[in-house]
Design a protein with these regions (language model features):
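C-terminal regions of mature proteins
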Residues: 366-396
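Active-site cores that bind ATP or allylic diphosphates and position pyrophosphate for catalysis
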Residues: 3-5, 9-13, 19, 23-24, ...
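Surface-exposed helix-capping loop/turn segments at secondary-structure junctions
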Residues: 163-165, 264-269, 377-386
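N-terminal Rossmann-like or analogous alpha/beta NTP/dinucleotide-binding catalytic cores
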Residues: 1-96, 100-227
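General N-terminal targeting signals
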Residues: 111-112, 143, 186, 303, ...
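Non-membrane alpha-helical secondary structure
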Residues: 29, 36-40, 342, 359, ...
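Residue-level recognition of the N-termini of beta-strands and the immediately preceding loop/turn
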Residues: 92, 124-126, 165-168, 237-239, ...
Length: 396
């Protein structure tokens, strides 16, 4: 079902009232959103073509994961992955991370469920980084708020089933990370970072959500360090990075760093295996709620968020409007742990929503109920202590 992008005056008025903006401001946001949507669609295709990423569907498996079509249904493309099935599981690591700038969006939930599934079915040691110090540099958020949210994220992901015997969840306030950061930054240049910007950089810049130019570079170096750390500290041969395609620059730059570290004489080269590899799994994207390109924790109206009230969740899912029906389906498929049979039922209801909207609405109510359970779990994960910044940074 293809939805037109013409915005009516009534829609403009409703959005203006909800966002507490003038109609002119909303119209201007919409104009930018259309440009960003067109740009992002072209850019995603160009990234895949220019970097020669391999698209799904594909018959590739990752240590038997993928035999039930999981990779084809949840990922868009991959890079340098085939070799990883030949490397023993105990020589591999999975690395991903989440910025604790706000409550999890549907996009964040999607990434969490994907990495939990990868950990469970591959048996690969998994690192999840809650990047409070990276977010301090990349977003305009108070440090205490980021620390508090980081505690909540860690508790929440553990409650969802993260296996601590086969992985670790940590923040960026970590000695080993600081050591590896120095190694990574020693082989990076400003040009490397400027030539590999995040796809949504212009949108975040327009909305005044970014830190300064230097701090953004620091933030991105934090992420490269996350990827390199298992290779340096744990002597792993391979790191697999599950991430959205709009953030493909992270594993791409990390591979550049790794190649340079292998060549840097005088000690750095001895800290990485010469046969070390970095691969990436690029997940399918959930679109932002109309008119935004992607769901972002930093843009509340773009996303469905576990911090939303029950009334907001009902409005965004049940009363989403025809422009967002497909976004809700994307969420159901990607941001849930529903069984394959239940997902087939949801897809069928969506495909027939014009003639049988009642069945589709029933599916949406089931998903709303699922999200409310997650919301309750998120709220139960809240960090109860008052934040003492010094204690958190230097004692805990």
């Amino acid at each position: 079902m293809k939805i037109g992008l013409n915005l009516s005056n009534d829609e403009l008025k409703e959005m203006a009232e909800r966002q507490n903006k003038s109609i002119e401001e909303v119209a201007n946001d919409y104009k930018h959103a259309l440009k960003e949507l067109e740009y992002s669609n072209k850019k995603l295709g160009k990234i895949i073509k220019d970097f020669k990423y391999t698209k799904f569907p594909n018959d590739i498996r990752l240590h038997n994961y993928g035999k039930n079509n999981e990779l084809n249904s949840k990922y868009l493309c991959y890079d340098n992955l085939k070799i990883f099935s030949k490397i023993p599981v105990n020589e591999l690591a999975i690395v991903t991370g989440f910025g604790p700038t706000n409550s999890p969006t549907a996009g964040t939930l999607c990434s969490i469920f994907r990495v939990l599934e990868l950990q469970k079915y591959t048996g690969i040691y998994t690192h999840i980084i809650i990047s409070e110090l990276s977010a301090l540099n990349s977003r305009q958020k108070p440090l205490n708020e980021l620390i508090q949210n980081a505690h909540q994220f860690i508790s929440f992901i553990k409650k969802l089933g993260f296996d601590e015997k086969k992985g670790e969840i940590r923040t960026h306030n970590h000695h080993d990370h600081a050591r590896v950061f120095a190694l990574v930054s020693s082989v990076l240049s400003t040009r490397d970072l400027l030539e590999n910007l995040e796809m949504t950089n212009d949108m975040y810049k327009r909305l005044q959500l970014l830190g300064n130019d230097f701090s953004k570079m620091v933030s991105r170096t934090y992420t490269m360090t996350d990827i390199i750390l298992p290779i340096v500290r744990d002597k792993k041969r391979g790191v697999i990075v599950p991430v959205g395609l709009e953030e493909h620059h992270h594993p791409h730059l990390a591979r550049i760093v790794l190649d340079r570290m292998k060549l840097k004489k005088g000690g750095v080269d001895s800290l990485v295996r010469q046969d070390a590899e970095i691969g990436a799994l690029y997940g399918r994207l959930i679109s932002g709620l109309f008119p935004y390109v992607k769901m972002s924790k930093s843009i509340p109206d773009s996303s469905i968020n576990l911090g939303d009230s029950l009334e907001e969740l009902h409005r965004k899912i049940i009363d989403c409007g025809k422009r967002n029906e497909e976004v809700i389906l994307q969420m159901i498929v990607l941001a849930s742990n529903w069984s394959p049979g239940k997902l087939i039922k949801a897809k069928s209801a969506f495909e027939n929503l014009i003639t049988d909207y009642k069945s589709w609405k029933k599916i949406k109510y089931e998903y709303l109920k699922f999200l409310i359970k997650l919301k309750t779990l998120w709220e139960k994960s809240e960090y109860q202590k008052e934040i003492d910044t010094y204690q958190e940074m230097f004692v805990s």
